[in-house]
Amino acid sequence: MKQTILIFLISFLFSSYSYAFEGQVILITDGDTITVVNNGKPEKIRLYGIDTPESKQAFGNQAKNFTYSMVYHKSINVEPVTTDRYGLTVGIVNVNEKCLNSELIDKGFAWVYDRYCKKDMCDKWRLLEKEARQSKAGLWSQDNPVAPWMYRRNRNK
């Protein structure tokens, strides 16, 4: 019985573990959502731990354009973290030894999404956000930027 439980636990751990993969970016939906060709199939990826302005928000297009300039038609590495409620892979995206997630924060095009950002790197990202705020980079040049989750909440009322 103990052996059966042990085998089950080991197989469960390995089945839920997601491996990093390489792919080419074919579409930029917005600043924090891209589509990558993975094993010949398109896969939508949501960037882990961050939230960029919505398309109709101030700096929404700039965030999308920044993401486009960093990854469009480039080979990237995706480190899956989880799957969201819509079935999208949520992950960390690296291109040319740079992390897209952290670059968006550093340039002032994204908030750290504290509700979901729980990995160790999130502490570093919070410091990057603080520095971007202090230097008034990107969206932080506005007097009162509205976080995307607040924008969505208010829009849906």
What function would you assign to each model-found segment?
Residues 2-157:
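Small beta-barrel nucleic-acid-binding modules, primarily SNase/OB-fold domains
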